Structures are given as C-alpha cells and as structure tokens.
Regions:
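Residues that mark the junctions of alpha-helical repeat units in TPR/alpha-solenoid scaffolds
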Residues: 96-99, 103, 123
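Catalytic core of nucleotide-sugar-dependent glycosyltransferases
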Residues: 55-62, 68-93, 117-136
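GHKL/Bergerat-fold ATPase module in large chromosome/replication-associated machines
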Residues: 88, 103-106
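Residue-level signature for tetratricopeptide repeat
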Residues: 106-113
C-alpha cells in the first residue's frame, strides 16, 4: 500500500481503466489539494500497482501555481484521507494497521508544525487525535 510520505503515483504518468473510477470513486472534490493521494489510497488498499523500471517522465516541482504552494500544512489533507480510509470496513487488518501508523506519523508532523508556529489550540486538538489513534493501534 502506497501511503508513506507523499503520493508516489503521479496522475499525469498513470494509465487507468475507467472501471477504476467506478470501483473506487473519483477524485474527492471536497479536498482543496492532495485529491490524487486520496484516490491512490483507496485504490492501493485493495489493488496491486505496477511500476516501470525506467523513468519516462520529467517531474518539475515547486512552481508558485502548484496547490502545494497555495495551502499551509498539506498533511491536513492527507490526514483527512487517511481517516476516511480507516472507515472502510473492507480494509485488511494489515492495511488498517499501516494506515493507523501513517496517520499517527502525519498527525505528529502537523502537531510539531503547529507548536512551532504558536498554534497551540490546533496542537492540542491534534494531540487528542494522536492519543485516540494510538489507542486503536494498541488494541489491534
């Protein structure tokens, strides 16, 4: 399952059959960013992906018009997607545990950034979530 760090699948370098969208849904339009991460989480939790061994695309990042440049705390969107994935009753136990682990990791990163920027209220809210999800992980 591809959940670590950033999305490792680029939509512009992907070939999908239209049935993928029928089976796993489309991009979540309620997300302002990371909607591709959300889709790949849903897909990779149940399907295998195949990567070509050679690099066929050139990725250029960091442009001012990229969504990652427009919004603070991009992990907020990834956290939302991970929480949403946990609600899927068909998620295997191992993928449930992987998702919980990654969710806790991202919550800690966002909490650290919140503390660094003096947003104590958000940090406290995130800490409550961390405690909650750590409890779920320990119950596994």
């Amino acid at each position: 399952m591809c959940i670590r760090d950033r999305c490792c699948i680029s939509p512009s370098s992907t070939i999908l059959h239209y049935s993928v969208f029928k089976d796993y849904g489309k991009f979540d339009e309620s997300l302002k960013a990371c909607e591709d991460y959300d889709l790949w989480l849903r897909y990779c939790a149940f399907e295998k992906t195949h990567f070509l061994g050679e690099q066929l695309t050139i990725k250029n990042g960091g442009h001012s018009d990229q969504l990652s440049q427009l919004y603070w705390g991009m992990d907020r969107f990834r956290i939302y997607s991970l929480e949403k994935l946990l609600q899927n009753k068909n998620l295997s136990r191992s993928n449930y545990q992987l998702t919980l682990t990654e969710l806790i990791r991202k919550l800690k990163i966002l909490m650290g950034g919140s503390i660094k920027r003096g947003n104590i209220e958000l940090a406290e809210e995130l800490n409550k979530k961390i405690i909650h999800f750590q409890g779920l992980l320990e119950d596994e």
